[in-house]
Curated annotation (Swiss-Prot):
Function: Has antimicrobial activity.
Family note: Belongs to the frog skin active peptide (FSAP) family. Phylloseptin subfamily.
GO cellular component terms attached to this protein's record: extracellular region
Protein name: Phylloseptin-J3
Record's keyword terms, sorted: Amidation, Amphibian defense peptide, Antimicrobial, Secreted
Principal localisation: secreted
GO biological process, one term: defense response
Length: 19
């Protein structure tokens, strides 16, 4: 589960950057 956290943060960051 901990290994998924950076991926989730990266996805959120990419979405925020797209907005």
């Amino acid at each position: 589960f901990l290994s998924l956290i950076p991926h989730a943060i990266n996805a959120i960051s990419a979405i925020a950057n797209h907005l």
